[in-house]
Amino acid sequence: LTVEDLIRLTMRTGEMAVEIIKQLDDANTSVYDNPSPHTVNVNIKKGPFIIISGHDLKDLEMLLKQTEGTGINIYTHGEMLPSHGYAGLKKYPHLIGNFGGAWQDQQKEFDNLPGCIIMTTNCLMRPRDSYKDRIYSTNVVGWEGVKHIEKKSDGEKDFSPVIRQALELGGFKEDIEPHNILVGFGHEAVLSNAQSIVDAVKSGAIRHFFLVAGCDGAKPGRNYYTEFVKQTPSDSIVLTLACGKFRFNDLDLGEIGGL
């Protein structure tokens, strides 16, 4: 293959990736509506809980329905964080926040948790013995010795074993003062503020846009993007996606004209 052939193949790969993401976006928004900006508490609340991780919004919805009225709090984890922006999911009052950071921190964050965890997709690390009896898998993800939740013939799943164990474990004993971060800035949310953004650019209030994206790594000291975002000028807008966001999404960067 020539260099030109490789460039054409690369461009075609990109086109296919964009189309796949469009189909995924259409599937999510047709069921749960377009994401909109929403604050998410990243600290814990007293009471029994289930943490759900991964990318499968349908699994989250089924869990939310099955835990209504049980007193169980639901926390997202990892790439489930953006679900808080969808109207069809954030309407459940017991979807109360997000627990932990990126995938590589799960072993220390899940250590001796007084609650249950459900992994819906990839990024499951070898569970430690301290929580192996309270972590569940579903879909294509799994680990030897980890309990697996299968899909029934009607497409539904029965999370009652997880619910029972979460109630038995009792959960967190006390609240921690809330700390909120922002999610929900999908393309529809950005476009709905297009005129304000254009006006801010024309006035000079916004001079830079940074999209800081990508998957994170587990090696200690990989804090380049944390330091980068800290040093972005005050006339900047920073957008982020993928698990690299956990390097800096808890930073308070302020607002520009309400944006």
Positions of the model-derived regions?
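Metallocofactor- and cofactor-centric catalytic cores in central/energy metabolism, strongly enriched
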Residues: 1-259
